[in-house]
Regions:
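Charge-dense, extended regions
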Residues: 368-391
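Conserved hydrophobic site in ankyrin repeats
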Residues: 345-346, 376
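Structural signature of tandem-repeat unit edges
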Residues: 1-105, 113-127, 137-152, 162-175, ...
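Boundary/linker segments of alpha-helical solenoid repeat arrays
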Residues: 354-361, 384-390
């Protein structure tokens, strides 16, 4: 039978199956786990899932007896006996984690809901498995050692990593599965420069992605569709269970050696998408081509509006300006609901007539956006007071 020392907050298991018997108060309090079972489970997946489902948020350390045939612990983290797989990181570990040299696989769910902020991955790691870092909301930085052998990153690997704003995968990566960054905080991303690279769709589902970059040599080897399609969202994006304020409706798409493009996040399939793809391919066929107004291919009004805003900021085209002027009333309200910064992006274009400034001022006052209020008041035509009017 398991034992629990409330003073040291240490839980001791004599058999793995005792995990099922633990009351909630122990799961809530325990900081140390000692396992004296010498056996290896039939599947490492069951082992990791069993520990993960305990939901021991304060657990900082796991100690497995030396006689166990399948597992060992280094710095409180569980690895396979031969060290080739990282299986489980306790949720109570915080700060920086360095993966053991010689590890080849960061396993499924191994860091799910962890509280680490940084991780260094050695050059020996070849694969990051499904949902490996899922819901690690404090994870900000992922470092890869020089000479990395990482070749495969599986689906939802960084799902829900809200603090992860950018990441640079090593050029050794050959395969990136779908929705790797779904619901994460990723804002900028550069594709690995590898001629063998295969990327599945919807890479940035429900992400606040702002900019994607493609190396020129890689584009020349593989064409544009390999990198453009994963940036787009499928038609279901509007039904995802996420904060709509975080999702971006348009992004800057860059290929080294070419001007950037402003693209909507969702383009309806069919003839509309075919025209969109044709315009993109035509643009990247000639280095000095004029950037097309791709906002018109947006799947709905929001995508068209945001892509037009990006297009105008990049190139000040007449078409994108017309679109902004036509939609500014609804856009100002929507941007204000998101944040003062988002509204400022629209306001500071300085292309508005007095009635629009008045409308924006009213919205800014309702939201108590003091900096914007001051800015707009400076832009409004100065009114003469009655006392200054000569008779």
């Amino acid at each position: 039978m398991y034992e629990y020392d409330s003073k040291t907050k240490t839980l001791t298991l004599n058999e793995w199956r005792e995990i099922r018997l633990l009351p909630s108060e122990i799961r809530t309090e325990a900081e140390h786990l000692v396992c004296n079972d010498r056996r290896r489970l039939k599947s490492d997946v069951y082992f990791t899932r069993g520990l993960m489902e305990l939901c021991m948020r304060k657990l900082k350390n796991v100690i497995i007896c030396d006689e166990n045939s399948g597992y060992k612990t280094i710095d409180g983290i569980v690895y396979s006996k031969d060290g080739s797989k990282l299986l489980f990181c306790p949720a109570g570990i915080t700060g920086h984690v360095k993966v053991l040299d010689g590890t080849k696989i960061i396993s499924r769910n191994s860091f799910t809901s962890s509280q680490i902020s940084e991780i260094t991955i050695p050059d020996s790691v070849e694969m990051i498995d499904d949902v490996a870092f899922a819901s690690s909301i404090s994870l900000e930085h992922v470092y890869f050692s020089a000479g990395s052998k990482l070749t495969e990153i599986r689906s939802d690997a960084f799902y829900g990593c809200k603090s992860l704003k950018q990441i640079t995968f090593p050029d050794s990566v050959e395969y990136m599965q779908y929705e790797i960054f779904k619901n994460s905080g990723i804002e900028t991303f550069t594709y690995p420069d590898n001629a063998k690279l295969v990327v599945e769709d919807d890479l940035f589902a429900n992400c606040p992605i702002k900019e994607v970059k493609v190396p020129k040599a890689l584009y020349e080897q593989k064409g544009i569709s390999c990198f453009l399609n994963p940036c787009l969202s499928d038609y279901m994006h509007q039904f995802y269970e996420t904060d709509s304020k975080e999702f971006t409706e348009a992004i800057v798409f860059r290929v080294e050696g070419f001007k950037p493009l402003a693209i909507p996040r969702y383009v309806k399939p069919g003839s509309n998408f075919d025209k969109f793809a044709n315009d993109v391919n035509t643009f990247f066929s000639h280095e000095n081509s004029e950037a097309p107004d791709l906002y018109k291919y947006g799947g709905n009004g929001l995508e068209k509006e945001d892509a037009a805003l990006l297009q105008y900021k990049l190139y000040q085209t007449k078409s994108s300006r017309r679109s902004l002027v036509l939609n500014v009333w609804s856009m100002a309200k929507r941007k204000a609901e998101k944040s003062e910064e988002a509204m400022a992006e629209l306001v500071t274009l300085d292309i508005w007539k007095p009635d629009v400034w008045e409308h924006m001022l009213k919205i800014a006052q309702e939201k108590e956006y003091l900096s914007l209020i001051a800015y707009i008041l400076e832009k409004l035509p100065k009114r003469k007071s009655k006392s200054n009017v000569s008779l």
